[in-house]
Amino acid sequence: MQGTLSVWLAKRGLIHRSLGFDYQGIETLQIKPEDWHSIAVILYVYGYNYLRSQCAYDVAPGGLLASVYHLTRIEYGVNQAEEVCIKVFMHRSNPRIPSVFWVWKSTDFQERESYDMLGITYDSHPRLKRILMPESWIGWPLRKDYIAPNFYEIQDAY
């Protein structure tokens, strides 16, 4: 079953895949990494002007990584805002997708956190560097195949 946004995108020849609806009735779409930036701009112009959240997760050990965007279409005089969830899957061997920082500025820290924890590179992000872990940290702590170091060093605890 396709939602209204999926039908709208299909009428305009924009490649995507409908993943159905979540428990709240929010439509979920899958977009290819190479199509993500252009579709993000189209969604912004269409009215999805608010990025509610961006996160990322490891689908399975040795499998794909996913970057997830929750967008809201806010219009004056409308009681119920439209929402959509966009998922962009990529191979862990080269996890790269275009940054949408220049579309929604609020992705700044969120894309940096996804980079820091999972190693997803967001091309054209202006400040893509670690935000939670020290710059010297090796590896991506939220990947399911991550092997945690067996030492803990507490510095300046008091």
From Swiss-Prot:
Catalytic activity entry: a plastoquinone + NADH + (n+1) H(+)(in) = a plastoquinol + NAD(+) + n H(+)(out); a plastoquinone + NADPH + (n+1) H(+)(in) = a plastoquinol + NADP(+) + n H(+)(out)
Gene Ontology cellular-component annotations: chloroplast thylakoid membrane
The keyword Translocase is annotated on this UniProt entry: yes
Subcellular location: Plastid, Chloroplast thylakoid membrane
Coiled-coil annotated spans: none
Short name of one Pfam family: Complex1_30kDa
Leader sequence segment: none
Keywords: Chloroplast, Membrane, NAD, NADP, Plastid, Plastoquinone, Quinone, Thylakoid, Translocase, Transport
One GO term (biological process): photosynthesis, light reaction
An MF annotation (GO) of this entry: NADH dehydrogenase (ubiquinone) activity
InterPro entries reported in the protein's UniProt record: NADH_DH_suC, NADH_quin_OxRdtase_su_C/D-like, NADH_UbQ_OxRdtase_30kDa_su, NADH_UbQ_OxRdtase_CS
Topology class, membrane: Peripheral membrane protein
EC number: 7.1.1.-
The protein's assembly and partners: NDH is composed of at least 16 different subunits, 5 of which are encoded in the nucleus.
Function, in words: NDH shuttles electrons from NAD(P)H:plastoquinone, via FMN and iron-sulfur (Fe-S) centers, to quinones in the photosynthetic chain and possibly in a chloroplast respiratory chain. The immediate electron acceptor for the enzyme in this species is believed to be plastoquinone. Couples the redox reaction to proton translocation, and thus conserves the redox energy in a proton gradient.
Family of this protein: Belongs to the complex I 30 kDa subunit family.
Name this polypeptide is given: NAD(P)H-quinone oxidoreductase subunit J, chloroplastic
